[in-house]
């Protein structure tokens, strides 16, 4: 499953995650683009995924049509937009189906009142003007927003339902398409997300393309989606800004000794909380630990009073893909000082790591694995694609040559190539994990060489009907567990034998349970527990997405059926934990979901200390770094987080980060959040 939060392009940034509330308009009832319609394509390095068209209707309204299949996730939508004299949307209607269900959405202005209804929310605004940014809709329709931002200049424009956006112009670049060379310019849009969104304009300052892991480009320019010059320029523009932020925090003064006194200390090695402790960090290491008041502060040291607060090791997100430079900065602000990135392109991983080591990027320490998938229409974008056992082994060797940590096999892999690929990876000292390929059961993947199973739905595949297992490289990997998990007997002899073998082999599980809480249980309209504490502090657009619903209901299943299946998923975590199967906490999201992941582990029977170990010492052990980090112990690296509250009683206190120490550098969390684009503290 890929619930990527990179949101590199504006098209992804405003896509809905909403539950179907009524039967969506069928594909054959949607608008049909005429000959001569402006044509865009959606592509990645895995190939073409879809088409988007735009044309003008006889009455002057603008129509859009989007048709896409991304690894089996279907989008069939249309949109009609009416603009007023100022070029702002006066009326918008969206129809069809997205991967998350019914895409229906309407917006209209009557007099001074604007009203909207989407699958995420509904509301109105009386007297406030602005550009209505759909919760979903056809991505290309946001070309109108770009036009308005260009016309507005530095002042920007107000957004509806709320927010304010601006556009800044960057450098030009000459590219070549089917009609010859073309000059385009890079721009950044702010106010949509907490970080800028980059896109490209043509020579007339009109929207031209989004280029990223998934790109939207004009037909005839498909090749530019993987043009190194475009990606390099995008990265360089962002890198310049984040470099100045990194230098602001990574100062000599920030590396001075620091003494935390009168703190509640979490000993991750023993899994206990110790009251009224003192911890001294010096020269990037933990120098001393003792009773409060027992450690003298060295000359030039900073002393922090920790009364009412808890000092924990630097937090790990064991499933957080390296996104843009801003997302990794936000994770530092949330106390994530180390992370595993299970599926990152080699060049991106090497660039980010190099800039981190040089002090140009504020990012936790990454442990990166690379996707390997069979060349197939359903292959993962960003993967090294293979066509045989030999090319699988070659891909594994390429990952090792890059100096990265592991390989992550994906759902379209030929099962016959897993064992030889895993054997080569182990010979080279690489970690092997991933989704379980279609037609394989998880125990078969483990026997073939998996050290770890990624995502709990693939663990649940052990008990799924064969027709679900056979299509695990499609939406069946979500819909199967959503439909059938509720009926699984977790205590059956077969499942008990399964748990025992996972334990015996030392197999690790990366549950990402928080994903399934969102996809299986949510009706929409209110923020999920993972996001509620962040409402109002990141961006208005994300606030709307945080109120989205779950995966669309299929066949005759109800949301209550899905909720029962999620309860069984929580039960599966409980059974794995009781059987002694090690688990590491990850999000496959923004990172802000991590605390909710830990809260769900407590629901599954973990103690708060055990849950916190899954995000500290346990992942450090998995990556082989536990001798130097993962716990607060004398001689280890000074990776620590001071949070407001008693974590032993309330894991939610982990959201209230006060101070972050990464490799001995002391940083104020309020300043980090501000730099990352947050407007306040999570609740």
Which role does the model predict for each range below?
Residues 22-80, 91-106, 151-177, 220, ...:
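N-terminal cleavable signal peptides for secretion/export
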């Amino acid at each position: 499953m890929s619930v990527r939060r990179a949101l590199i392009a504006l098209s992804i940034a405003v896509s809905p995650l909403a539950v179907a509330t009524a039967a969506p308009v069928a594909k054959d009832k949607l608008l049909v683009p005429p000959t001569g319609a402006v044509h865009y394509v959606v592509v990645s390095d895995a190939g073409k995924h879809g088409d988007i068209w735009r044309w003008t209707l006889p009455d002057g309204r603008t129509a859009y049509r989007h048709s896409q299949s991304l690894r089996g996730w279907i989008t069939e939508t249309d949109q009609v937009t009416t603009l007023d004299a100022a070029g702002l949307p006066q009326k918008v209607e969206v129809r069809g189906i997205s991967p998350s269900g019914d895409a229906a959405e309407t917006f209209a202005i009557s007099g001074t009142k604007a009203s909207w209804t989407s699958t995420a929310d509904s509301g109105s605004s009386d007297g406030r003007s602005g550009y209505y940014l759909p919760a979903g809709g056809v991505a290309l329709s946001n070309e109108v927003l770009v036009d308005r931002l260009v016309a507005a200049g530095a002042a920007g424009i107000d957004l509806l339902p709320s927010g304010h956006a601006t556009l800044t112009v960057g450098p030009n670049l000459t590219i070549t398409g089917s009609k010859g060379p073309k000059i385009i310019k890079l721009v950044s849009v702010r106010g949509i997300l907490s970080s800028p969104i980059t896109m490209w304009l043509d020579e007339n300052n009109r929207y031209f393309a989004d280029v990223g892991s998934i790109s939207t480009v004009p037909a005839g320019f498909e090749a530019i989606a993987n043009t190194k010059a475009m990606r390099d320029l995008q990265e360089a523009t962002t890198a310049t800004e984040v470099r100045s932020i990194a230098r602001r925090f990574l100062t000599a003064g920030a590396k001075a000794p620091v003494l935390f006194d009168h703190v509640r200390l979490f000993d991750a090695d023993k899994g206990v909380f110790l009251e009224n402790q003192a911890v001294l960090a010096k020269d990037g290491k933990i120098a001393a630990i003792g009773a409060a008041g027992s450690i003298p502060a060295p000359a030039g040291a900073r002393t922090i009073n920790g009364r009412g607060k808890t000092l924990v090791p630097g937090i790990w997100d064991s499933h957080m893909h390296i996104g843009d430079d801003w997302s990794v900065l936000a994770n530092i602000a949330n106390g994530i000082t180390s992370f595993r990135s299970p599926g990152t392109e080699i060049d991106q991983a090497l660039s980010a790591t190099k800039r981190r080591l040089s002090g140009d990027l504020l990012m936790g320490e990454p442990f990166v694995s690379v996707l390997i998938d069979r060349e197939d229409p359903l292959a993962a974008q960003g993967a090294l694609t293979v066509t045989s056992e030999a090319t699988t082994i070659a891909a594994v060797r390429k990952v090792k040559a890059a100096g990265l940590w592991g390989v992550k096999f994906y759902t379209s892999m030929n099962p016959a190539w897993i064992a030889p690929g895993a054997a080569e990876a182990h010979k080279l000292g690489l970690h092997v994990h991933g989704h379980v390929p279609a037609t394989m059961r998880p125990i078969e993947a483990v026997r073939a060489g998996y050290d770890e199973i990624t995502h709990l739905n693939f663990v649940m595949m052990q008990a799924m009907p064969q027709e679900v297992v056979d299509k695990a490289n499609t939406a069946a990997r979500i819909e199967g567990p959503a439909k059938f998990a509720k009926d699984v007997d977790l205590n059956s002899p077969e499942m008990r034998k399964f748990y025992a073998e996972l334990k015996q082999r030392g197999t690790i599980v990366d549950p990402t349970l928080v994903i399934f809480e969102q996809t299986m249980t949510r009706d929409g309209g209110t923020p999920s527990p993972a996001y509620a504490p962040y409402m109002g502090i990141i961006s208005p657009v994300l606030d709307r997405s945080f109120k989205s619903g779950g995966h669309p209901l299929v066949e005759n299943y109800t949301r209550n059926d899905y909720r029962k299946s999620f309860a069984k998923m929580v039960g599966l975590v409980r059974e794995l934990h009781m059987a002694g199967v090690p688990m590491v906490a990850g999000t496959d999201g923004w990172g802000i979901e991590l605390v909710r992941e830990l809260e769900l582990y407590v629901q599954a029977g973990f103690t708060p200390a055990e849950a916190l170990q899954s995000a500290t010492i346990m992942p450090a052990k998995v990556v082989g770094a536990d001798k130097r980090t993962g716990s607060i112990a004398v001689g280890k690296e000074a990776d620590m987080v001071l949070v407001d509250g008693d974590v032993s009683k309330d894991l939610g206190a982990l959201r209230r980060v006060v101070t972050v120490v990464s490799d001995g550098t002391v940083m104020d969390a309020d300043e980090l959040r501000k730099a990352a684009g947050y407007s306040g503290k999570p609740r």
